[in-house]
Amino acid sequence: MKKLGLCACYNHKNYGSQLQSYATTVELKKRNIDYEIIRYKKKITPLLLTKAIPRLFNPVFINDRIIETFQKKLMLKLHSQLAEQNAVRNDAFNKFSENRFKKLSPIYYGYDELKKQSEKYTAVMVGSDQLWSPSGITSNFYNLMFAGDSCTKISYATSFGVSQIEDRKSVV
């Protein structure tokens, strides 16, 4: 019997992602919907690396990923107490994730495997805030482009996370 495939940030170490994912799974259980959280990892290939190069010069990507990551690492290095608290927090996130998210797919490595495995789902659903942000909308995972036409695509509480999208990003 086919089931629903859920694309969610269940293992991201922030409260919003984990609580949204958990609330979604609780609601699916309440409605007796058979589901599993889809686990997908990009296969690093020369083509993927080549496609990623323009993103390194994208101001949104630079701000969202590079600058924020650098600032966080610098703060943790300069303030050892913050690093200790962060380690405790990350441990709590890991335990929450391990205890709450049991219905997981096998890990699908690479886009081709993700597309192939999507055939086992009646529907795929994306659920969490800001998964369609300009820096991530083109991933073809959270926008559900991997699923074929016969698979129902559902968005639950998904947003762009910005109030305006640049013209060059508006064609999705």
Where are these regions (language model features)?
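Aromatic- and Gly/Pro-rich donor/ligand-binding loops
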Residues: 4-15, 19-167
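Conserved small/polar residues in nucleotide/adenosyl-binding loops
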Residues: 171
